[in-house]
């Protein structure tokens, strides 16, 4: 993705296909659906650490990531998993429980 020229201190719309450097500004959090950690509502404020899971923030104090219970993606700890999540680690495309191993067949 590329930044929107001239938009680095304004809110980008999702249709503008901006990168985090454009959107991750105070008051503009979440405008592109992938902004975390810039202190705005739903973006990583209120002591929220971690990384992005789609349009949500993963990590301590954050919700909306699907958790780590079972398969299907979401957060593993403070990290975002792609296709599956096993225990405390990420793996894919198939999650084999209860141990965090992957069967890619």
UniProtKB/Swiss-Prot annotation:
Example of a GO cellular component annotation carried by this entry: intermediate filament
Top-rank lineage group of the source organism: Eukaryota
Print the keywords alphabetically: Keratin, Repeat
What quaternary structure, including any partners, is listed in this protein's UniProt entry?
Answer: Interacts with hair keratins.
Biological function? In the hair cortex, hair keratin intermediate filaments are embedded in an interfilamentous matrix, consisting of hair keratin-associated proteins (KRTAP), which are essential for the formation of a rigid and resistant hair shaft through their extensive disulfide bond cross-linking with abundant cysteine residues of hair keratins. The matrix proteins include the high-sulfur and high-glycine-tyrosine keratins.
Full protein name: Keratin-associated protein 17-1
Which lineage is the organism of this entry classified under, starting from the top rank? Eukaryota, Metazoa, Chordata, Craniata, Vertebrata
